[in-house]
A protein has these predicted regions:
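A short SAM/SAH-binding and catalytic strip from SAM-dependent methyltransferases
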Residues: 153-167
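Class I (Rossmann-like) S-adenosyl-L-methionine-dependent methyltransferase catalytic domain
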Residues: 2-3, 18, 22-28, 33-88, ...
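Short polybasic linear motifs
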Residues: 14
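A short acidic, Gly/Pro-enriched loop at the edge of an enzyme's catalytic core
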Residues: 145-155
């Protein structure tokens, strides 16, 4: 467990501060990478630096997947009472989902491999006076978070798992078991995988099989939805997996 010293501002579910989000995007487009505070001091392993640099380059502009607000599936999960603190947001990017959940009273830690994205998320939290925390961290090293004393009753994943390779997915699932105690929930949104031979995307069938092999998990919901991007709306699945 962990706490912050700031009190989050609580607003209405489903109505994030869109004006603030638009201002964030405008400022980032005009001054990419030079208007943000210090990045948390966590060293990125040398093997991951090329990947981090790729995402830094994306976040120097405004990536297509950064729509300035949380995806609707996560808004509805909050309204349904599925989110319990503390919350881990894996692959948090510039922090819109983390900030949304924190603004509604949850303790949230957002992690991402991109130092620039984390700097932007940290600045958003400071500017909006929202008590969310952010850390440069590899989501495939969740056991390292456990070693630092972190556990989470909810892990949210807005389009990170769907880019992983088969081996990375197994490693990530193993890491989830390290940080989610019995009764905890993993909620994942990703582009729909229509062909089970494809390496990209997610499907309820694949998740049921993968978490079933790992043992100790159960799918509690799975439905079709939309993953919104700035210039498109892609078919997606939203799946909840509970730790037994």
């Amino acid at each position: 467990m962990w706490r912050t010293n700031e009190d989050p501002r609580v607003g209405q579910a489903g109505n994030p501060d869109r004006g603030a989000a638009r201002a964030d995007r405008t400022r980032r487009a005009q001054h990419p990478g030079d208007r943000f505070g210090d990045t948390p001091t966590v060293s990125i392993p040398s093997r991951l630096r090329p990947i981090a640099h790729v995402y830094d380059a994306a976040y120097a502009g405004v990536p297509n997947w950064d729509i300035g607000r949380p995806q609707r599936a996560f808004v509805r999960s909050l309204e349904a009472g599925l989110v319990r603190s503390p919350v881990l947001d894996v692959g948090c990017g510039t922090g819109e989902l983390s900030l949304f959940l924190a603004r509604h009273g949850h303790e949230v830690l957002g992690i991402d491999l991109s130092p620039l994205a984390i700097r932007q998320a940290t600045e958003k939290a400071r500017w909006r006076r929202i008590a969310a925390q952010f850390l440069v961290w590899d989501a495939l090293d969740l056991s390292g978070l456990r070693e630092r004393g972190f556990t989470f009753r909810t892990v949210v994943d807005s389009a990170m798992f769907h880019i992983f390779s088969d081996a990375e997915r197994d490693r990530f699932v193993a890491g989830l078991a390290d940080v989610i105690p019995s009764g905890g929930l993993y909620c994942v949104l990703g582009d729909a995988r229509r062909d089970e031979r494809s390496a990209y995307g997610i499907s309820p069938r694949e998740l049921r099989q993968r978490f079933g092999r790992a043992g100790g998990w159960e799918i509690i919901f799975a439905f079709e939805t939309i993953f919104e991007r700035q210039w498109s709306r892609n078919p997606a699945f939203f799946v909840g997996v509970r730790r037994r």
